[in-house]
Design a protein with these regions (language model features):
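Conserved inter-motif catalytic segment of the P-loop NTP-binding fold
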Residues: 1-77, 82, 86, 93, ...
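Short, intrinsically disordered low-complexity segments
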Residues: 14, 70, 116, 130-133, ...
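Histidine (H) residue identity feature
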Residues: 23-25, 106-110, 191
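Phosphate-binding/switch region of NTP-binding enzymes
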Residues: 63, 82-171
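Short amphipathic alpha-helical interface segments
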Residues: 184-192
């Protein structure tokens, strides 16, 4: 996995350590690479591709995560069809050149929470869209598939729970875990 962190990079190492502690018995996770530099839709992509190839011991990734779309579009306009198309073209090139799947994390708008903020190009060009919604003030998050181009959509919501992991006396991080069936809302049928 190549994870390109452009938002929250300072604390990302703590998130990795917490995940390792919770899901990997405290052992370092293998095959996980932090990407640098952040690919920008407005710049030449080849330095990112070359860096990704050099950083991988096997020259291949099963997944590339871009966190976030907004940061990968620095200096561009998310509402512009032309700029959004430049971003989705960049994603397609990363997919093609690294022979991988790309997960681009994007925020919803402040007033419209049922779709990604910015141009409708993001939704139109995406193969799959999964919306994450925090359920109230607890740490339960529902995952709703709103688009799936080449396979059946999920029939039901899926859920994850954010669990606090203490790394030391002062440092704590949240990690996604599978919730118990009794932790999911009664109106939604649990679907692991």
């Amino acid at each position: 996995v190549l994870f390109v962190v452009s938002e929250g990079r300072f604390n990302f190492v703590n998130r990795i350590r917490a995940w390792e502690q919770k899901h990997n018995h405290g052992e370092k996770v293998q095959g996980f690479v932090l990407g640098d530099p952040v690919p920008l839709a407005s710049e030449e992509l080849q330095p990112f591709i070359n860096g990704a190839c050099c950083a991988s011991p096997t020259d291949e990734y099963k997944l590339v995560v871009l966190d976030t779309v907004g940061r990968s579009m620095a200096g561009m306009n998310e509402n512009s069809q032309q700029d959004a198309s430049a971003f989705t073209s960049m994603v397609e090139r990363i997919q093609r050149e690294l022979n991988t799947t790309v997960l681009a994390l994007h925020h919803t708008g402040h007033n419209v929470t049922n779709r990604a903020r910015g141009s409708s190009v993001f939704g139109a060009d995406a193969d799959t869209i999964i919306r994450a919604d925090r359920q109230g003030k607890d740490y339960l998050v529902s995952l709703t598939m709103t688009k799936q181009k080449d396979a059946p959509e999920w029939e039901k919501k899926k859920f994850i729970k954010l669990s606090g992991v203490s790394l030391d006396l002062e440092t704590k991080s949240l990690v996604a875990v599978k919730p118990g069936e009794d932790e999911c809302p009664k109106g939604d049928k649990f679907h692991p």
